[in-house]
A protein has these predicted regions:
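Class I SAM-dependent methyltransferase SAM/SAH-binding core
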Residues: 41, 46-92
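C-terminal alpha-helical "lid/dimerization" subdomain adjacent to the S-adenosyl-L-methionine
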Residues: 12-13, 18-19, 130-139
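A short acidic, Gly/Pro-enriched loop at the edge of an enzyme's catalytic core
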Residues: 91-102
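Conserved SAM-binding loop and adjacent beta-strand
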Residues: 9-29, 33
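A short glycine-rich, Lys/Arg-flanked "PGG" loop and its adjoining helix->strand segment in the class I
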Residues: 116-130
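N-terminal, positively charged/glycine-rich alpha-helical extensions of SAM-dependent methyltransferases
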Residues: 1-11
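A short SAM/SAH-binding and catalytic strip from SAM-dependent methyltransferases
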Residues: 101-115
Length: 139
């Protein structure tokens, strides 16, 4: 990540429920593995808007954002116990190979996509895992 970042001082704006018109909880969950033992990586988690929707359906979520301040905002709102905030860039993921059953990127993939970040996502995704990217469209 790092091409553009959302102003962490405006993080409350990311909690606006009208964001569901772009992608609902159900639309995300239908494409991701779920269950108590499932580990997900949320790339560009921000203040945790979509992370909160995924957390009740899986064992653990790594909420990765390049801005530590976003994690602070998320903690202030109330971070679920099964969410681990990670401050790192998508091109250098601090996880072992095959760590995650699923990876999700909502409205941030256009900011973090490089050959390196795609290779890193593939590296940390378990065999048979799912990568789901939901992003803006010019249409």
């Amino acid at each position: 990540m790092g091409f553009h970042t959302f102003d962490a001082a405006e993080a409350d704006r990311l909690s606006d429920p009208t964001r569901f018109r772009f992608c609902s909880r159900e639309e995300l969950l239908q494409h991701l593995p779920t269950g108590d033992g499932t580990r997900l990586l949320d790339l560009g988690s921000g203040s945790g808007f979509y992370t909160d929707e995924l957390a009740p359906h899986v064992g653990r979520v790594a909420a990765l954002d390049v801005q530590r301040a976003m994690h602070g905002s998320y903690r202030d709102r109330g971070m679920p116990d099964n969410v681990d905030p990670i401050t790192a860039e998508a091109g250098s993921l601090p996880f072992r190979d095959g760590t995650f059953d699923g990876i999700v990127s909502t409205m941030t993939f256009h900011e973090s996509t490089t050959e390196g970040s795609i290779a890193e996502a593939a590296r940390v995704l378990a065999e048979g895992g799912r990568f789901v990217a939901v992003d803006w469209s010019a249409a």
